[in-house]
Amino acid sequence: MAPPQRHPQRSEQVLLLTLLGTLWGAAAAQIRYSIPEELEKGSFVGNIVKDLGLEPQELAEHGVRIVSRGRMQLFSLNPRNGSLVTAGRIDREELCAQSPRCLVSFNILVEDKLNLYPVEVEIVDINDNTPRFLKEELEVKILENAAPSSRFPLMEVYDPDVGMNSLQGFKLSGNSHFSVDVQSEAHGPKYPELVLEGTLDREGEAVYRLVLTAMDGGDPVRSSVAQILVTVLDVNDNTPMFTQPVYRVSVPENLPVGTPVLAVTATDQDEGVHGEVTYSFVKITEKISQIFCLNVLTGEISTSANLDYEDSSFYELGVEARDGPGLRDRAKVLITILDVNDNVPEVVVTSGSRTIAESAPPGTVIALFQVFDRDSGLNGLVTCSIPRSLPFELEKSVGNYYRLVTNAALDREEVFLYNITVTATDKGTPPLSTETIISLNVADTNDNPPTFPHSSYSVYVLENNPRGASIFSVNALDPDVDQNAQVSYSLAEDTLQGAPLSSYVSINSDTGILYALRSFDYEQLRDLQLWVTASDSGDPPLSSNVSLSLFVLDQNDNAPEILYPALPTDGSTGVELAPRSAEPGYLVTKVVAVDRDSGQNAWLSYRLLKASEPGLFSVGLHTGEVRTARALLDRDALKQSLVVAVQDHGQPPLSATVTLTVAVADRIPDILADLGSLEPSAKPNDSDLTLYLVVAVAAVSCVFLAFVIVLLALRLQRWHKSRLLQASGGGLASMPGSHFVGVEGVRAFLQTYSHEVSLTADSRKSHLIFPQPNYADTLINQESYEKSEPLLITQDLLETKGEPRQLQQAPPNTDWRFSQAQRPGTSGSQNGDDTGTWPNNQFDTEMLQAMILASASEAADGSSTLGGGAGTMGLSARYGPQFTLQHVPDYRQNVYIPGSNATLTNAAGKRDGKAPAGGNGNKKKSGKKEKK
């Protein structure tokens, strides 16, 4: 069997395909670098060895080199570290010109593996070229009649950089007539255009010097400037044109000298000198120039001599119109003379006055003139007349003389100049007449006072205005002239609130501007009534007055003031009582506030700002009533703290806050017991005092029944009472029966009283505040007038031993009685017009509790009489000590009655009692409790 034949050509083809595949795969992984232009020679471009996966020492082993198609070798390999570096300075503009991207491509050849690796290096442009104008100075000539928005190309600017480093914009020095706009061709350079923003006037400014700045967008920005000289050229492109080529007119031969015959008109659309047209005669004889004259500015042709039909009946005149530079136009004027009676009457004013006072009486002579006619016979007889509408008349004088006189009063303010036309007419056929105008000026007299356009003024000024600010301006008009019309302003003297009016406002005598000399306060001054006087400078001066009402407008500059509860002065916090059995909506108290502002600045709203137990209480938005929002629970704390904010509706709103302390308990003993459990006893004396208070309150229930029985017995046997008291001789004070009430009265008594316990924040002791009850009869003995009444139980009082005294009943104290408006009651018991409401009969209950506590304290001692010592208010037990409460301050100073400025006071001269002598220790304790 023959061996298989080999095909060497096929093997070479397979090898070539394998090599090409290897090179193609290597070429797919192209290496890219990016460097800025203008790098120094040998600058690092990229780590080519790392990117090829070789080591630096393998460069020579593998035969790694750069294969480039260009003649210039831009890059080279560093044999030491195998990095690609620049072979020299690279200028992007020289290499790629204006191409957006500059890419340099070459290959890295690994000879031993025959692998080619394409490398692409992007040369990034830097801002190394400044925009350059091809010309640094350029003159632009513009016709003065160039239309706005006209464009004028300027010199080109060249910047070889690309992108943001190339030319980006232009800036023109500030000028209102020109602006610069940038134009650019598609993929071409940018060039500026000068844009005319408005019309030019060569006579106003003939040359403009502008500075044009070209800027690129590099960092930093490079720029260059060029000077632009704009010259405005004058244009005369319109020739004067007559309105018609031939003018024809016919005039009578008796036309007076100087009478206009005809007016020719030529128009020139140019402006300035180019539009100024002058007129002149052309190609006329000397005789014609003596008869007619032409106004060079108006084109009016008039007679300069008498016309005579018999001498010449026709005239032909040549007229030329010419502008400043010399453009001209011509026309013909044909004048025909008509044959008429050529002698007209003539009027010659021989004497007269051109000015007359407006106060001149009727019959004053103004002028004397003469009339005559050159004709004879009837044609020479002349009559004169003036318009009947004028306040003048003609009077015949000697011969052909006439006098012009006034026949009515003159008023310069109505007519200050009269042009009196005197018409002279002959009796020819047809009659001829002539007119002469006599001008008469009417001189002013001071016969008109200054008048204000309004009968009165109302000025509104916000309060707190700055001093010296102008608040209003008045203007009086005087129809007179000169000195008679010069108006000065002043204010009538007056006083306001004990101060002169001039201390509030002043007025500028020349301008009539009213200034405020002080800052107005709406709460102190709400309006001013002023009288402004306007006087002229005539002789005698005339004046008029106008009323000016200045109203001060309110600003929200007063925060709400809280009237109830009053802010404490002794450091303690007033406590409101809310029973635990209170239902939702129970009225606990009411916050009463006022605002001195007015309008919506005084509208108040109340809100609960902070509460120790959220959701337990609510505050009425408009009433300020503090009510329970839900039923009270056992877990609710005894002491509840509420912060109520009162805010007005001003802009910006102002507010005030008040802190309320609410004690949650059904009875005062509960409060004392809870307070005793809240704070441990720090001193033995404090514990004893608390124990005494608890024992005294516990005895109330026992004493109360006996107290009611005694009151009922006294009411039924009141007629025996005085006899029994006189017979007893035991020192009991007599008590009128009318001072006691029965069981039903006590029940009503309980219902009409409320209580208020003022608890200090650091003590278990309480101040029981007794308000005035709402009945007139009060049990008060003589000693109660001489001692303080608040029930503050101290150790001194417990240690005081009663001594026998001669008791005597004092008459009722009228200072303790309220007027109807001052009586406390529920928040709804008073009319809506009252200034405040009393929350929930709190004083009444407090009064009853104090009376019962006083009785219980005396009963506990067992040595007092029923008349009572001072401070018991006539309710002490029969065998109790004389309980005086002499060391306690007068509670009535702490009682505030909303809606009234009344203060609970004792009778005059009986308020301050002297304290009994005691030990030093007892005095210190009393002082400490008074401070609390």
From Swiss-Prot:
Residues 804-841, 902-932 are annotated as: Disordered. Residues 30-692 are extracellular. Residues 922-932 have a biased composition (Basic residues). The keyword Iron-sulfur does not apply. Keywords: Calcium, Cell adhesion, Cell membrane, Glycoprotein, Membrane, Repeat, Signal, Transmembrane, Transmembrane helix. One of its GO terms (molecular function) is calcium ion binding. It is found in: Cell membrane. Residues 714-932 are cytoplasmic. Its main location: membrane. Residues 806-841 have a biased composition (Polar residues). Potential calcium-dependent cell-adhesion protein. May be involved in the establishment and maintenance of specific neuronal connections in the brain. The keyword Iron-sulfur does not apply. This is Protocadherin gamma-A6. One of its GO terms (cellular component) is plasma membrane. GO terms for biological process: cell adhesion; homophilic cell adhesion via plasma membrane adhesion molecules; nervous system development. It is a single-pass type I membrane protein. It comes from the Eukaryota. The lineage of its organism: Eukaryota, Metazoa, Chordata, Craniata, Vertebrata. The chain crosses the membrane at residues 693-713. Glycans are attached at N81, N419, N545, N685. Residues 1-29 form the signal peptide. InterPro entries: Cadherin-like_dom (IPR002126), Cadherin-like_sf (IPR015919), Cadherin_C (IPR032455), Cadherin_CBD (IPR031904), Cadherin_CS (IPR020894), Cadherin_N (IPR013164), Protocadherin/Cadherin-CA (IPR050174).
